[in-house]
Amino acid sequence: MSETYFKQAAITGASGIIGRYIVKDLLAAGWHVRILSRQLQDWSDQPNVQVVVADINNQDALEELLAGASAVFHCAAELHDETRMHEVNVLGTACLLRALLVTSTVKYFSYLSSAGVIGPSFAHIIDENCECHPSNEYERTKYKAERMVAEAGLNMQVCILRPGNVFDSDSPGLVILPLENTIKHKILLFIKGNEGAHLIHAKDVAAAALFFMHKKLSKIEIFFLSYDDDKRNTVSGVYRLFRSFSSERRRCCFFSLPDSIPYIMRKLRHGNSLHGGVRFSEDKLRSFGFIFPLGLEASLKLVYNSRKVLN
């Protein structure tokens, strides 16, 4: 696809954990990148980057963002402030879709959603055919945006990605357990150790977003992104694997509760949630020929090596 027309891409959320890897990969592949940002950012060292300073709800700015673009990556989202989630995740997506409908050059649109849209589930394996029942505001707004994308009638290839728990060296997330190894974290390991971690490195999410740009998608496709086919992608499995990189090679001897116990604890406090034994299937990804460039072990090794350098 990138060989047949001008390499101009547009991206929202370019400063986020996934967006910045997409920008890096596009630049490395020789693309010109136009990004939307609420604040002026210094990209003076990247002549192929242009910044459009505006909010996601600014219709004129979005049309400027998309002008001449062949590929669009929508990564912008509000993850923390519930009072802004509808405005950003739903209304912002609606504005972007309106801009896409009047932009004739776009051939590929990638929407970054979340595996969390599946909501509470007891299913052992979750795939793209499972029904979604989002339970919190973030999940609901991301799923509503998904449905808007699916029903917008876009005349282009559309890919919806649902990453699990995204991490990298700057935002290690669950990997903080073996990094800090405090009493508090050991208690968490005891309680949640046998639950799925659903980790996915941001670099592998970006790789998937660019991979499907080069596939001929006959219809809108949805993909879960998680290393869950690797049996070590549990809270305790990640802890053991990360600790195994140390030259000290100290044995990791600990006991973790069955995954049903933390589920019951969450249910008593917050109601139904995703059961800790759930795994997100990689079967559909593989059927399209995509293999994670990093995978679980290599992605954790990246974090480990970066922390070693810092220390």
Located regions from the model:
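Conserved Rossmann-fold NAD(P)-dependent oxidoreductase catalytic core, especially the SDR/UDP-sugar
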Residues: L91, C95-E137, C159
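NAD(P)H-binding glycine-rich loop region in Rossmannoid oxidoreductase-like domains
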Residues: Q41, D45, V53-L91, C95, ...
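Amphipathic terminal alpha-helices
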Residues: Q8, R286-S287, L294-N311
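Glycine/proline-rich active-site loop of Rossmann-fold NAD(P)-dependent oxidoreductases
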Residues: Y143, F167-L177, F212-F224
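NAD(P)-dependent short-chain dehydrogenase/reductase
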Residues: L154-I160, G164-A197, A202, F242
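N-terminal Rossmann NAD(P)H-binding glycine-rich loop of SDR-like oxidoreductase domains
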Residues: A9-A29
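Catalytic helix-loop patch of NAD(P)-dependent Rossmann-fold dehydrogenases
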Residues: F122-L161, N165-V166, L188-F190
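Mid/C-terminal beta-alpha module of Rossmann-like enzyme folds, strongest
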Residues: A208-R269, Y304, L310-N311
